[in-house]
Structure formats: structure tokens, C-alpha cells
Amino acid sequence: MLNMIGISPIKPIITKVDPQDARKICSFVVPDSKMGDLYLEMKHPQNGFCHSFITELRNRFHKLLGYEEFAYFNDAKDIYGLHIRVGDEYQRKGYNLGEILRLSSIIEIIENKIKNFNILSKDTAIYFHSKYKFKPDVTSVSDCDRLLKTVIEDKTPGFEKIAGKAKVLMQKIESVKSKEEQQHFCEVTNGILEEYITKAIETKTQKQHPFTSTMNMTLTDDTVYKNKEFFNDLFKKHGIDYKI
């Protein structure tokens, strides 16, 4: 069990990218996990149109267990998640390596005053990202159609009301012409998708409600602060001395 009696939480090391770059990156140790001490390090960016970072999580033998790639575009207060992955042999084994990687990006949001962390989630990772407060952020009518079909086709008892909402909305979307209407219906679609995902998580039936396509998702700084106790508890759980 993490953060046991006698195990002192370890404070992350926060440093600037370089003396001319005010952005900050972090590294930290996860003490006495199920796999022993784990070491997380954010690597320096490569310059170009955007600044790409990679966060690596390794064990005491320096074996790479998981990583996340993300990017800042110049002069933007957004982060764009490119890829997050944990080694196949460590997935769904209770090691929570993906959770540790996600906590490093929460630190990145706070320390750099980031407004939005944007990702394109693959279908099998939507529930993972939702667990850490990412929300659907669909912005095109074609994506609305594609994702609403998943909800409409779900015949599981208890999900009829949400499926009905999705069906009515899709019928309305078919006649959409103006950009203003498109934006409105995308916002409504995001609400329905969030309701659907939340219900699946609350009933612990995610496997019975799979998505079959990618989804744009966003974690905002407002959402992080509203859920700071949730994230602070996760930092404590993993022995990371950090509070929002």
C-alpha cells in the first residue's frame, strides 16, 4: 500500500526548462510503491513549431514503465497531449502507473498556469481520462454524429433516458446549417456524452459501454481547482508531497 506509516512523502523537484524559458518541468520519486521506488522525469523540449516534452516513469533498474508525450505551441496557454502509454505487462495490474503519469501533468498545469490540457483520446482510453476529470470536447457536427450513435445504440437497461436524449439531438443536428447552431449542438452533445460516461463509471460498467472511435477531451484549470481534494488525495496516496 502506498504512503504507509513510516514512509515520508517526497516533494517534487520543479525547475525551469532553461534560464531563458519561464516554463517549469517536474521530476519526483514515488516511494515504496508495489514495484519499489519509482522515478518520474520530464525531459527537456525540442525547439520547433511547438515544444515537445516527454515524461518518463522508470523503476530503480532504470527500466521504462510508461511515458507521456505532450506539447506546448508557442505563446499558448494550452497543453496538447500527444500520447500516454504504460507497458502492456503493467496495465490493469493495480500498479496505477498511468495515474502517476497523469499526476505529473496536473503539476504541469498548476505550475505553468495552463488553461486547457487538450487530448484526442483513443476509444479504449476515454474512461481512463474521464476518471481524472477530462471532459468531452467535441467541436464538429461529424464528430457529434459519430459519438452520439454509440449512445443511441446502447440498449442497456438504465441507459434508456440518455439514449433517448441522444436520438432526439441527432435528429435536430441533421437540419443544422449555421455555425452558431453547430456550436450549440456540439455543446449539448458534450453534455450528453459526459452524462453517459459518468453513469458508466458510477455503475462500474465501463466494459459494457465501450466507445468505438476517438474523442476530443479537455481538462481545464477550473476543473482541476474544483476537484483539488480529489487530486490532493491522489498525491498523498502515491507519497508525492504536493498540494493544489
Give the location of each predicted region.
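A metal-dependent hydrolase signature that marks the N-terminal structural subdomain at the beginning
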Residues: 8-43
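Short, surface-exposed basic-aromatic patches at helix termini and helix-loop junctions that form
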Residues: 104-111, 132-135
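Conserved GNAT acetyl-CoA-binding A-motif
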Residues: 107-122
